[in-house]
Amino acid sequence: MLKGLSFHVKKGEVFALLGGNGAGKTTALECVEGLRRYDSGAIAVNGRVGIQLQSSSLPAHIRPLEAVRLFAEWNRVKADTATLAALGINSFAKKQYLELSTGQKRRLHLALALLGDPELLFLDEPTAGLDVEGRVSLHSQIRRLKAEGKTILLASHDMAEVESLCDRLAILKDGSLVFCGTAAELTAKSGSRYTISIKTEQGDESFFADNIADAMLDLLEGYRQKGIAVLDIKTDRGTLEQHFMELTGREQQ
């Protein structure tokens, strides 16, 4: 359930809906896409839209170029051969859909979403399930589309992906918006907060602290009183992912 969610996406930017499982990012994206009804509020979408769903699928025996032709006919548009070439569709054009790798399926569905040269793209977990090579390839395509002036709204749970691709992000927790802005603004929101990583004979632990000197003294005294030996201690101002976990109350994996 979404609760008072409000944000806007600027023309030509890559904007991420970020959150853990169940945070509401896919629900929010489906509302924007018109795939889910909402009880109150209003959504304005300005421009032609292309959609890539996380759970997209096609008939098992259809071939990529046949799928492109059919979708183009249904939507009364022409397929752009340059786009198909840029996405590498021709390299697996002779395969049936059931024979395609996850990465090839993602590229095919992105090609289908781009039919008709939409001004806006909605991508739901575009790199979920891809290996490193597939992720790098799809990230490259998203950057190319941004350079061409596309406005892209994507849902993701991957902070590294968001940091690499997006101009701004909205963080959702339990259906509510807890942050909206740039990655730099998210870091600044945490102020001077430090991350203290402590390695003991019983395992590793991490803590957040505003006053690092006092916090370290308190932590070390606490371990001493418990009779736990501290083997190593490190401090830093925290990664973007750590700021995200702090904001959403998630535990580091």
Where are these regions (language model features)?
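Helix-to-loop junction immediately C-terminal to a conserved catalytic motif
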Residues: E33
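Conserved ABC ATPase "signature" region
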Residues: G50, R69, K78-A93
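Catalytic Walker B motif of ABC-type/P-loop ATPase nucleotide-binding domains
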Residues: L121-E125
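Short, charged/small-residue-rich alpha-helical element at the C-terminal edge
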Residues: E185-Q253
